[in-house]
Amino acid sequence: MNAKIKVLLVDDSAVVRQVLQQVLERDKNIEVIGAAADPIFAQLRMSKQWPDVIVLDVEMPRMDGITFLKKLMAERPTPVVMCSTLTSKGAQTSMKALAAGAVAVVAKPAVGVKEYLESAAGELIMEIKAAAKANMRNMPAATASAQSMALPAKFSADAVIPLRTGGVIAGANKIAALGTSTGGTQALEYVLTRLPRNCPGIVIVQHMPEKFTAAFAERLNSICELEILEAESGHQVAPGRALIAPGGKHMLLRRSGAQYFVEIMSGPPVNRHRPSVDVLFRSVAQAAGRNALGVIMTGMGDDGAKGLLEMRNAGALTIGQDERSCIVYGMPKEAAKIGAVTREISLERIPQCVLDMGASLTASAQRG
């Protein structure tokens, strides 16, 4: 029998601590070993028993969550799931938490927290289980995914975009599609900061809630040569530009002649995610086919696996991040299981692979 995941709760609200403990202990695989009102009390509790995962509030007395997180990562890296309010200020704070080493950030409302946590326990439990599997050796300064807490029914990409065979236009621009979840912000930062402005146009799904993706895109845009934007319907996918799907919406690739653009739309969560990697990858398979490169990276679950297989069947080049370099080897593993991955490579090799494969796509288009 597998050992339970030992969780420590750190939040200055007694109500939140009580509700969190109640909802988490409904899962037979989780054991709450303590609840602390602030990081000072948390450190005392950790001196007696070290947790597998820490659920940490951001704003607390005596020491704020970001300061404690930085201290923890410097002394003994431990998976941390941060709780942040779903506001513009909370989104900026979440980016600081990810940069400081949080494995995941979950959103909570500014009001009605008790009712929200009780109704949305499933997503928090899923994040804790993903965090418990995180390979902290691969966790440098920046990391992780942020997700909304509602756990919806599991729909397939059919609920958003019908399956069909797409055509390919010779001479159409090359494009790269990236999909990732837990550990993804760190991985995406690594890849995007190493790409020049003449790289292929890029479309990205990173599992993240509404309001958080804009802050994520803004941060990346400030440190990359590429133009990084939170996508809007009609945005053109052009060389030197990366478009990130907005939280709470699906992103689809469309084609007009030899040019690509994106469509942002609502619809049910697919594989319990909105945006969904499967939705993006299916649309890329249909719009770009063999003119595309698909990359599935670190993350929990199977979102993107079927879509990547559709890309491969449409003639696209497909790669998966290898287990050694993943924070959580879930999505690439599931894609490899069903034959969707042409080959697996380390995170360190992905930027050059994007450039090399982009060059080969250009050569193929010129020959065609």
From Swiss-Prot:
GO terms for biological process: chemotaxis. Belongs to the CheB family. This is Protein-glutamate methylesterase/protein-glutamine glutaminase 2. It comes from the Bacteria. Residues 169-355 form the CheB-type methylesterase domain. Residues 6-123 form the Response regulatory domain. Keywords: Chemotaxis, Cytoplasm, Hydrolase, Phosphoprotein.
